Protein backbone atom coordinates (compact mmCIF):
# COMPACT_ATOMS: atom_id res chain seq x y z
CA UNK A 1 0.00 0.00 0.00
CA UNK A 2 1.53 3.36 -1.00
CA UNK A 3 1.69 6.38 1.29
CA UNK A 4 -1.08 8.31 -0.52
CA UNK A 5 -3.54 5.41 -0.19
CA UNK A 6 -2.66 4.95 3.48
CA UNK A 7 -3.23 8.64 4.18
CA UNK A 8 -6.60 8.59 2.40
CA UNK A 9 -7.79 5.63 4.46
CA UNK A 10 -6.71 7.38 7.67
CA UNK A 11 -8.62 10.54 6.76
CA UNK A 12 -11.77 8.52 6.00
CA UNK A 13 -11.55 6.67 9.32
CA UNK A 14 -11.20 9.95 11.22
CA UNK A 15 -14.25 11.34 9.43
CA UNK A 16 -16.32 8.29 10.40
CA UNK A 17 -15.19 8.55 14.03
CA UNK A 18 -16.09 12.26 14.06
CA UNK A 19 -19.60 11.58 12.73
CA UNK A 20 -20.20 8.76 15.22
CA UNK A 21 -18.89 10.88 18.09
CA UNK A 22 -21.15 13.78 17.16
CA UNK A 23 -24.16 11.51 17.44
CA UNK A 24 -23.14 10.45 20.92
CA UNK A 25 -22.84 13.94 22.49
CA UNK A 26 -25.35 14.17 25.37
CA UNK A 27 -27.40 17.26 26.23
CA UNK A 28 -25.97 19.31 29.11
CA UNK A 29 -27.43 18.38 32.48
CA UNK A 30 -27.77 20.37 35.70
CA UNK A 31 -24.27 19.42 36.82
CA UNK A 32 -22.60 20.92 33.74
CA UNK A 33 -24.57 24.16 33.36
CA UNK A 34 -23.21 27.34 34.97
CA UNK A 35 -24.69 28.14 38.38
CA UNK A 36 -26.38 31.46 39.15
CA UNK A 37 -26.54 32.92 42.65
CA UNK A 38 -29.36 35.27 43.65
CA UNK A 39 -28.81 37.13 46.89
CA UNK A 40 -31.73 38.54 48.83
CA UNK A 41 -32.14 40.26 52.15
CA UNK A 42 -35.39 39.76 54.03
CA UNK A 43 -37.07 41.08 57.10
CA UNK A 44 -36.51 38.56 59.88
CA UNK A 45 -40.04 37.31 60.59
CA UNK A 46 -40.77 35.45 57.33
CA UNK A 47 -37.32 33.84 57.47
CA UNK A 48 -37.67 32.64 61.06
CA UNK A 49 -41.21 31.41 60.33
CA UNK A 50 -39.80 29.28 57.50
CA UNK A 51 -41.74 31.02 54.73
CA UNK A 52 -38.78 32.44 52.82
CA UNK A 53 -36.75 29.19 52.95
CA UNK A 54 -39.81 27.27 51.70
CA UNK A 55 -40.21 29.60 48.72
CA UNK A 56 -36.49 29.49 47.96
CA UNK A 57 -36.44 25.69 48.07
CA UNK A 58 -39.45 25.41 45.75
CA UNK A 59 -37.84 27.75 43.22
CA UNK A 60 -34.44 26.03 43.34
CA UNK A 61 -36.11 22.66 42.83
CA UNK A 62 -37.54 23.99 39.56
CA UNK A 63 -34.24 25.69 38.64
CA UNK A 64 -31.43 23.39 39.82
CA UNK A 65 -28.71 25.69 38.56
CA UNK A 66 -29.94 28.63 40.62
CA UNK A 67 -28.72 29.09 44.17
CA UNK A 68 -30.60 31.55 46.37
CA UNK A 69 -28.94 32.77 49.52
CA UNK A 70 -30.46 35.17 51.99
CA UNK A 71 -29.58 37.51 54.79
CA UNK A 72 -32.11 38.41 57.46
CA UNK A 73 -32.37 41.72 59.28
CA UNK A 74 -34.96 44.28 60.28
CA UNK A 75 -36.37 46.29 57.39
CA UNK A 76 -34.19 49.32 58.10
CA UNK A 77 -31.02 47.21 58.23
CA UNK A 78 -32.13 45.21 55.18
CA UNK A 79 -32.49 48.38 53.14
CA UNK A 80 -29.14 49.72 54.35
CA UNK A 81 -27.50 46.43 53.34
CA UNK A 82 -29.05 46.63 49.88
CA UNK A 83 -27.61 50.12 49.37
CA UNK A 84 -24.12 48.60 49.55
CA UNK A 85 -24.74 46.77 46.28
CA UNK A 86 -24.42 43.19 47.51
CA UNK A 87 -28.16 42.40 47.41
CA UNK A 88 -30.28 41.62 44.34
CA UNK A 89 -33.73 41.65 45.96
CA UNK A 90 -35.17 42.86 49.26
CA UNK A 91 -38.26 41.58 51.09
CA UNK A 92 -39.51 44.19 53.54
CA UNK A 93 -42.57 45.53 55.36
CA UNK A 94 -42.39 49.25 56.10
CA UNK A 95 -44.10 51.34 53.42
CA UNK A 96 -42.41 54.67 54.14
CA UNK A 97 -38.93 53.12 54.13
CA UNK A 98 -39.73 51.14 50.98
CA UNK A 99 -40.95 54.23 49.13
CA UNK A 100 -37.85 56.18 50.14
CA UNK A 101 -35.59 53.34 48.96
CA UNK A 102 -37.24 53.46 45.53
CA UNK A 103 -37.34 57.28 45.41
CA UNK A 104 -33.60 57.38 46.12
CA UNK A 105 -33.00 55.14 43.12
CA UNK A 106 -31.82 52.04 44.95
CA UNK A 107 -34.91 49.98 44.16
CA UNK A 108 -36.90 49.79 40.95
CA UNK A 109 -40.43 49.31 42.33
CA UNK A 110 -42.49 47.96 45.21
CA UNK A 111 -44.20 44.67 44.37
CA UNK A 112 -46.81 43.13 46.71
CA UNK A 113 -46.09 39.57 47.86
CA UNK A 114 -48.08 38.62 50.97
CA UNK A 115 -49.48 39.93 54.23
CA UNK A 116 -50.50 39.01 57.73
CA UNK A 117 -51.24 41.23 60.72
CA UNK A 118 -49.87 42.57 63.95
CA UNK A 119 -51.54 42.08 67.31
CA UNK A 120 -51.17 43.72 70.70
CA UNK A 121 -50.05 41.17 73.25
CA UNK A 122 -49.96 41.38 77.01
CA UNK A 123 -50.29 39.50 80.31
CA UNK A 124 -53.31 37.39 81.16
CA UNK A 125 -54.36 39.65 84.05
CA UNK A 126 -54.32 42.60 81.61
CA UNK A 127 -53.65 45.54 83.97
CA UNK A 128 -54.26 48.01 81.12
CA UNK A 129 -57.76 46.61 80.57
CA UNK A 130 -57.53 46.35 76.79
CA UNK A 131 -58.56 42.73 76.17
CA UNK A 132 -61.15 42.42 73.41
CA UNK A 133 -60.67 45.94 72.07
CA UNK A 134 -60.50 46.29 68.28
CA UNK A 135 -59.16 49.84 68.19
CA UNK A 136 -55.38 49.55 68.45
CA UNK A 137 -54.87 53.29 68.96
CA UNK A 138 -57.31 53.44 71.86
CA UNK A 139 -55.76 50.32 73.38
CA UNK A 140 -52.23 51.65 73.28
CA UNK A 141 -53.41 54.91 74.83
CA UNK A 142 -54.68 52.96 77.83
CA UNK A 143 -51.31 51.25 78.22
CA UNK A 144 -49.60 54.66 78.29
CA UNK A 145 -52.17 56.28 80.58
CA UNK A 146 -51.72 53.52 83.15
CA UNK A 147 -47.90 53.48 82.80
CA UNK A 148 -47.86 49.74 82.10
CA UNK A 149 -44.61 48.08 81.02
CA UNK A 150 -44.29 48.00 77.22
CA UNK A 151 -41.46 46.37 75.24
CA UNK A 152 -40.25 47.74 71.89
CA UNK A 153 -37.75 46.35 69.41
CA UNK A 154 -36.46 49.89 68.92
CA UNK A 155 -34.41 49.02 65.83
CA UNK A 156 -36.30 50.63 62.92
CA UNK A 157 -37.42 47.20 61.79
CA UNK A 158 -40.81 46.94 60.10
CA UNK A 159 -42.30 45.86 63.42
CA UNK A 160 -40.82 48.88 65.19
CA UNK A 161 -41.99 51.22 62.42
CA UNK A 162 -45.53 49.84 62.75
CA UNK A 163 -45.40 50.34 66.50
CA UNK A 164 -44.27 53.95 66.02
CA UNK A 165 -47.14 54.51 63.58
CA UNK A 166 -49.64 53.39 66.21
CA UNK A 167 -48.08 55.60 68.89
CA UNK A 168 -48.15 58.55 66.49
CA UNK A 169 -51.82 57.94 65.70
CA UNK A 170 -52.47 57.93 69.45
CA UNK A 171 -50.65 61.25 69.84
CA UNK A 172 -48.13 59.74 72.27
CA UNK A 173 -44.33 59.85 72.34
CA UNK A 174 -43.37 56.82 74.44
CA UNK A 175 -39.58 57.25 74.40
CA UNK A 176 -38.18 58.46 77.70
CA UNK A 177 -40.99 57.08 79.84
CA UNK A 178 -40.01 54.59 82.54
CA UNK A 179 -42.73 52.18 81.49
CA UNK A 180 -41.41 52.07 77.89
CA UNK A 181 -38.46 49.71 77.39
CA UNK A 182 -36.41 49.25 74.24
CA UNK A 183 -35.22 45.65 74.31
CA UNK A 184 -31.44 45.72 73.99
CA UNK A 185 -31.47 42.67 71.71
CA UNK A 186 -34.46 43.82 69.66
CA UNK A 187 -32.46 43.80 66.43
CA UNK A 188 -32.19 40.01 66.69
CA UNK A 189 -35.85 39.73 65.70
CA UNK A 190 -39.44 39.34 66.80
CA UNK A 191 -38.93 35.88 68.28
CA UNK A 192 -36.42 36.94 70.96
CA UNK A 193 -38.40 40.14 71.60
CA UNK A 194 -41.61 38.19 72.14
CA UNK A 195 -39.96 35.74 74.52
CA UNK A 196 -38.42 38.61 76.51
CA UNK A 197 -41.83 40.29 76.72
CA UNK A 198 -43.25 37.03 78.02
CA UNK A 199 -40.57 36.88 80.72
CA UNK A 200 -41.35 40.46 81.73
CA UNK A 201 -45.14 39.94 81.65
CA UNK A 202 -45.32 43.13 79.62
CA UNK A 203 -47.15 44.44 76.55
CA UNK A 204 -45.85 44.60 72.98
CA UNK A 205 -46.93 44.81 69.34
CA UNK A 206 -46.06 41.61 67.51
CA UNK A 207 -46.75 39.95 64.16
CA UNK A 208 -49.15 37.03 64.25
CA UNK A 209 -46.76 34.61 62.52
CA UNK A 210 -44.20 35.01 65.29
CA UNK A 211 -46.92 34.52 67.89
CA UNK A 212 -48.11 31.30 66.24
CA UNK A 213 -44.62 29.84 65.92
CA UNK A 214 -43.74 30.71 69.54
CA UNK A 215 -47.15 30.15 71.13
CA UNK A 216 -46.24 26.80 72.69
CA UNK A 217 -43.37 28.43 74.57
CA UNK A 218 -45.32 31.38 75.98
CA UNK A 219 -46.22 31.21 79.66
CA UNK A 220 -47.51 34.65 80.58
CA UNK A 221 -48.83 36.64 77.63
CA UNK A 222 -51.33 36.24 74.81
CA UNK A 223 -53.22 38.20 72.17
CA UNK A 224 -55.40 40.94 73.66
CA UNK A 225 -56.13 43.24 70.71
CA UNK A 226 -56.53 42.24 67.07
CA UNK A 227 -58.54 42.97 63.95
CA UNK A 228 -57.77 46.67 63.45
CA UNK A 229 -56.88 47.53 59.83
CA UNK A 230 -54.04 49.71 61.09
CA UNK A 231 -52.35 46.50 62.23
CA UNK A 232 -52.18 44.91 58.77
CA UNK A 233 -48.65 43.87 57.83
CA UNK A 234 -47.86 44.02 54.12
CA UNK A 235 -44.68 42.26 52.99
CA UNK A 236 -43.32 43.43 49.65
CA UNK A 237 -40.58 42.79 47.12
CA UNK A 238 -38.19 45.43 45.80
CA UNK A 239 -35.67 44.49 43.08
CA UNK A 240 -32.46 46.47 43.41
CA UNK A 241 -31.76 48.95 40.62
CA UNK A 242 -28.91 47.83 38.31
CA UNK A 243 -28.45 51.38 37.04
CA UNK A 244 -27.42 52.55 40.50
CA UNK A 245 -26.08 49.29 41.91
CA UNK A 246 -24.17 47.94 38.94
CA UNK A 247 -23.21 44.54 40.37
CA UNK A 248 -26.72 43.30 41.14
CA UNK A 249 -28.19 40.36 39.24
CA UNK A 250 -31.35 42.12 38.13
CA UNK A 251 -32.38 39.49 35.58
CA UNK A 252 -32.01 36.69 38.11
CA UNK A 253 -33.91 38.66 40.74
CA UNK A 254 -36.75 39.43 38.34
CA UNK A 255 -37.04 35.80 37.28
CA UNK A 256 -37.46 34.90 40.96
CA UNK A 257 -39.93 37.77 41.48
CA UNK A 258 -42.04 36.63 38.53
CA UNK A 259 -42.28 33.18 40.08
CA UNK A 260 -43.02 34.56 43.57
CA UNK A 261 -46.10 36.38 42.28
CA UNK A 262 -47.24 33.39 40.20
CA UNK A 263 -50.19 31.22 41.17
CA UNK A 264 -47.81 28.40 42.12
CA UNK A 265 -45.87 30.43 44.68
CA UNK A 266 -48.96 32.21 45.99
CA UNK A 267 -50.54 28.81 46.65
CA UNK A 268 -47.48 27.83 48.72
CA UNK A 269 -47.93 31.02 50.76
CA UNK A 270 -51.65 30.36 51.17
CA UNK A 271 -51.10 26.93 52.70
CA UNK A 272 -47.89 27.50 54.64
CA UNK A 273 -48.35 26.73 58.33
CA UNK A 274 -51.94 25.59 57.92
CA UNK A 275 -51.31 21.98 58.91
CA UNK A 276 -48.93 22.74 61.77
CA UNK A 277 -50.64 25.76 63.33
CA UNK A 278 -54.25 25.38 62.21
CA UNK A 279 -54.11 28.62 60.23
CA UNK A 280 -51.80 30.08 57.59
CA UNK A 281 -48.93 32.30 58.72
CA UNK A 282 -49.28 34.57 55.68
CA UNK A 283 -51.84 35.37 53.00
CA UNK A 284 -51.20 35.81 49.25
CA UNK A 285 -51.17 39.43 48.08
CA UNK A 286 -49.70 39.40 44.56
CA UNK A 287 -51.27 41.90 42.16
CA UNK A 288 -53.16 43.61 44.98
CA UNK A 289 -53.77 47.35 44.83
CA UNK A 290 -53.37 47.55 48.61
CA UNK A 291 -49.85 47.06 49.89
Write out the residue ranges for each language-model feature.
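Secretory targeting signatures
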Residues: 1-32
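Short beta-strand-centered segments that line the small-molecule binding cleft or hinge
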Residues: 79-94, 98-113
Amino acid sequence: MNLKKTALIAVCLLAVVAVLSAGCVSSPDASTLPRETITLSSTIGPVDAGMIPALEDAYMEKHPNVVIRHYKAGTGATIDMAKSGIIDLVIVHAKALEEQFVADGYGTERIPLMYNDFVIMGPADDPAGIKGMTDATAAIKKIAEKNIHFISRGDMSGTHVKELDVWKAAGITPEGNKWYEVYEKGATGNGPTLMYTDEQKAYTIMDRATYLTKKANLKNIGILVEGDEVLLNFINLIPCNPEKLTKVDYDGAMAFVEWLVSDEAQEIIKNFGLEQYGEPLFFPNANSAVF
